[in-house]
């Protein structure tokens, strides 16, 4: 498939066309295809996180070391408890800040393969309807770049090498926040700051 044919300007389609395209892409994701899609923060590489072969492809495309965990994107708050343990503090944060530009790292339940993450798993619910619609299974969510390079906020900023190796690219225009998500880890009743992004850590600490 040529580069032009794999890039889908999703918001230029009418509602009926968009629905058809998204249904097609959901089937393709279930079949192990790799998709780049814009989120509220950055463009990310998404694959079925339950499919180890597809996840391995994501690592290879990014040239990322396999000992570095990936985060996942889920469709809604109810999905989080399928894949991670949620205590009262985590629930408060989830209810207040998700969907939104936050990655919350929680103790992982069995189900997500260890190639994605071992003991703890980072989980996102982006404030962007297209990626949530595609999340009929948990999707990998990792920036659409070669590891260590700049993270893209538009399709034009994505490395050509990365574009060539994925199956589809969903162009949503410029990402809403255009900077990385804030990352926190919940251990017992403590919030551990991993990376400050869109949401200030102090705001989260008030929970």
Curated annotation (Swiss-Prot):
The protein's UniProt keywords, in alphabetical order, are: ATP-binding, Cytoplasm, Nucleotide-binding, Nucleotidyltransferase, Transferase, tRNA processing
Q: What is its main location?
A: cytoplasm
Q: Which residues form the YrdC-like domain?
A: 15-199
Q: Where in the cell is it found?
A: Cytoplasm
- Give the main EC class: transferase
Instruction: List, alphabetically, the GO terms of the cellular component aspect.
Output: cytoplasm
Q: What is its EC number?
A: 2.7.7.87
Q: Which family does it belong to?
A: Belongs to the SUA5 family.
The task this protein performs is described as:
Required for the formation of a threonylcarbamoyl group on adenosine at position 37 (t(6)A37) in tRNAs that read codons beginning with adenine. Catalyzes the conversion of L-threonine, HCO(3)(-)/CO(2) and ATP to give threonylcarbamoyl-AMP (TC-AMP) as the acyladenylate intermediate, with the release of diphosphate.
Q: Which NCBIfam families match?
A: L-threonylcarbamoyladenylate synthase
Protein name in UniProt: Putative threonylcarbamoyl-AMP synthase
Organism field: Methanocaldococcus jannaschii (strain ATCC 43067 / DSM 2661 / JAL-1 / JCM 10045 / NBRC 100440) (Methanococcus jannaschii)
